[in-house]
Amino acid sequence: NLDAAGISVGEALDAHALRFADLPQREKIATHAFVELHIEQGPVLAQANVPLGVVSGIQGVRWYQVSCKGASAHAGTTPTHMRRDALLLAMESLGRIDALAERLAGDDKRLTFGRWNVSPNAINTIAGEATFSIDFRHADPAVLDAFDNALSACLPADAELTSLFSHSPTAFDHQVINLLENACEATGLTWQSIRSGAFHDAMYLAGHCPTAMLFVPSRDGISHNPKEFTDPAQLKAGAQALAWSLVALAEQP
């Protein structure tokens, strides 16, 4: 798994550790539990008018990069039937990829083509190469695997498919989930079970200790945007449920 600069997570961590090699490290001790409070970053709670969400887990994800090859040529002198436009080849594959995701995931489809690069990116030149990313998420590892196995058949024959990142679905601890449900009940407010589609610290902590999460609504489902907003009363409700749950965890033997 490499980033846009071709650097792996391991390489980045090694470089980071070298910069701070002299910092003291805390003693490694067992962690009793981890609870994370976060905005939903989606519209589900807000549309349901529910102030609190107890998160059951986090969807798994597959990231890919697809590079479609064409032939750069003059935009005004090359007849249509003699062109090999890489961008058109890429766009034709989008419908097939979307149909695959729809068939496998139905209403739970989470498919995004978020990053594009077209070369030579000139107004008077046919695209010789078009590169785009695929972000596919689902809670069922079998669906993720099926998408992975069938994806290449959706692409042009000479397209280059690269896997960028993969993470299995995360299931949170049932006992911590039950404790958070009790915490929400203690606030006197309505709540519902919800699954996270975004990555959170809890996704990584779940492999080390019992873990779960609380969500509060995001107005209009907007996140990663200056318009991101959660009502202060809902923030208060989330903080109250978090405090209740932490006290309950602290009192456990």
Question: Predicted regions: what is each one?
Answer:
Residues 137-141, 164-168, 221-232:
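Short beta-alpha connecting loops at secondary-structure transitions
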Residues 169-187, 212:
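Short, low-order "capping/linker" segments at domain edges
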Residues 10, 14, 65, 87-98, ...:
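Predominant activation on well-ordered alpha-helical scaffold segments within soluble catalytic domains
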Residues 112-121, 132-139, 159-177, 203:
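A short beta-alpha structural unit
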Residues 103-111, 156-159, 184-190:
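Short secondary-structure junctions
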Residues 191-244, 249:
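Zn-dependent metallopeptidase/amidohydrolase metal-coordination segment
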Residues 146-155:
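Short amphipathic alpha-helices in soluble, non-transmembrane regions
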